[in-house]
A protein has these predicted regions:
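Structural alpha/beta surface segment adjacent to cysteine/selenocysteine redox centers
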Residues: 61-67, 72-143, 206-211
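Generic signature of intrinsically disordered, low-complexity segments enriched in small/polar residues
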Residues: 19, 41, 67-69, 113, ...
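C-terminal cap of thioredoxin/glutaredoxin-like
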Residues: 2-4, 28, 140-211
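Extracytoplasmic thiol/disulfide redox context detector
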Residues: 2-5, 14-98, 161-177, 181, ...
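Short clusters of hydrophobic/aromatic residues that line enzyme substrate/ligand-binding pockets
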Residues: 50-51, 132, 192
Length: 211
């Protein structure tokens, strides 16, 4: 027999669980953006190459920060997807919400891209076990990955105006798209909200192909 005194507590517990489930379901949504906005995102100048297929049937645009824990957690899932699905294109756009050091890290990858080593720089920074709190931390990671930081920094000094404009444009896109924080993910013109694990990422790509 159920103790009547425990009923209110159980009702409250059930209500809380239902509310939590509703919030989770609502959070895991996709929202289409205007076609012109999506085309502008795809056409905007970049300092780094696309990843995966050059012209895939599904394009994922990720706005990220090298110091963002959730971005670091998402990166291996994206890599796994690219390994299993050769028809996906990934465009990475820097959104250094964690500050100047994150922006410097982005600039380092732009300079590395000119050497044909963007993937090496990106992988080293996004998977770094040490915090990137100072420029010296970024330099240490880059040096360990085989980069000559005098050359990298010279390139950044020479092209800082160009690199800054690219980051500013990417940040403006996040406002236009209504992104709330890193990582910001857009798949074939739909803004993805909520946690993205590997299973959901695969599902989102499959859904994009249907539409």
């Amino acid at each position: 027999m159920t103790n009547s005194s425990s009923l209110p507590r159980r009702i409250l517990t059930c209500a809380f669980l239902l509310l939590a489930a509703g919030i989770t379901a609502q959070a895991q949504t996709t929202k289409p953006v205007a076609p012109a906005t999506w085309q502008a995102v795809l056409a905007s100048p970049r300092a780094t190459p696309v990843v995966g297929a050059a012209k895939g049937d599904v394009t994922i645009v990720e706005y990220f920060d090298y110091n963002c824990p959730d971005c670091r957690a998402l990166d291996p899932k994206v890599r796994q997807l690219l390994t299993s699905d050769p028809h996906v294109t990934v465009i990475r756009k820097d959104w250094p919400v964690f500050g100047d050091v994150s922006e410097y890290a982005a600039y380092c990858t732009y300079a590395a891209a000119k050497e044909g080593k963007y993937a090496t720089a990106h992988d080293a920074l996004i998977s770094s076990k040490q915090d990137l709190d100072k420029k010296e931390d970024v330099q240490s990671v880059m040096q360990a990955a085989g980069f000559d930081m005098k050359k990298i920094d010279a390139d950044i000094t020479q092209h800082q105006k160009q690199y800054s404009a690219i980051v500013a444009a990417d940040e403006h896109e996040t406002d236009v798209l209504g992104l709330k924080g890193t990582p910001g993910v857009v798949i074939n013109g739909k803004v993805v909200s909520g946690k993205i694990d590997y299973a959901r990422l695969v599902s989102l790509v499959a859904d994009a192909r249907k539409h």
